[in-house]
Regions:
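Peripheral docking tails and interdomain loops at the edges
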Residues: 157-201
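Conserved mid-sequence domains
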Residues: 46-141
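Short, well-ordered coil/turn elements that cap or connect secondary structure elements
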Residues: 88, 123, 153-155, 172-173
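Generic structural signal for well-ordered alpha-helices
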Residues: 142-146
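Long amphipathic alpha-helical segments
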Residues: 1-55
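Short beta-strand/loop segments at the ligand-binding rim of alpha/beta enzyme cores
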Residues: 148-159
Length: 201
């Protein structure tokens, strides 16, 4: 499947993500246990990463940069897949990982320094994507990253992908986009890039 002519992006959207949604539903209804869910999720993440490395090398690299941060264990798989998809369509994509258990009084400064070091001087669009199903880390990350808006040469966008329970709260956080759907987030990210090209042409 990985070496077929099927779009690698479509493999992730049409096969991997629906499978994970089904597994989540089965777990919530008690049809599978925690270890079975973990095994399937880990296998799906392995597939996503393999898709990244067998993806076409002919994709044009865009002047578009994204750092993806997970704020909860449950959102990690979506964050990893988002990173792979953006890589496959030509973005410079960085996946920081999950920070759910890393927060301390100085960690906000640590994240700000990292993002500034990696992305503040690049030319083009920069998008920071926050994936979190945890109210505390979602608030922490959005507040931490919003303070960087004035430190970037180019355009900086902040997007949040969360669950239905936290969607309303995320919409009140003064970020550029909020959603519960990975497909919607990717489409919004593409549209922001197209708009940035038009604005700078």
């Amino acid at each position: 499947m990985l070496f077929s002519t099927i779009s690698k992006e479509r493999i992730l959207f049409d096969i991997v993500l629906p499978t994970l949604n089904i597994i989540n539903d089965m777990y919530s209804r008690g049809k599978i246990n925690e270890s079975e869910k973990l095994l399937i999720f880990t296998t799906a993440l392995d597939l996503a990463l393999m898709t990244k490395f067998v993806g076409t090398t002919e994709t044009e690299q865009l002047k578009a940069y994204c750092m993806i941060i997970s704020g909860s264990e449950e959102s990690t798989y979506m964050a990893r897949i988002a990173s792979v998809i953006l890589h496959l369509i030509g973005w410079h994509s960085l996946y920081l990982g999950s920070i759910e258990n890393k927060i301390d009084p100085f960690f906000d400064i640590d994240i700000q320094r990292l993002i500034t070091k990696k992305l503040s001087n690049v030319e083009g669009l920069v998008v920071i994507q926050i994936f979190s199903f945890n109210a505390n880390t979602l608030k922490f990350l959005s507040n931490t990253i919003k303070t960087l808006r004035n430190k970037f040469r180019g355009d900086l966008r902040i997007a949040v992908c969360t669950n239905n329970d936290l969607l309303q709260a995320s919409e009140d956080m003064d970020v550029d986009y909020t959603t519960t759907e990975l497909t919607s987030l990717i489409e919004w990210t593409k549209e922001e890039y197209r708009n940035s090209i038009l604005a700078n042409s």
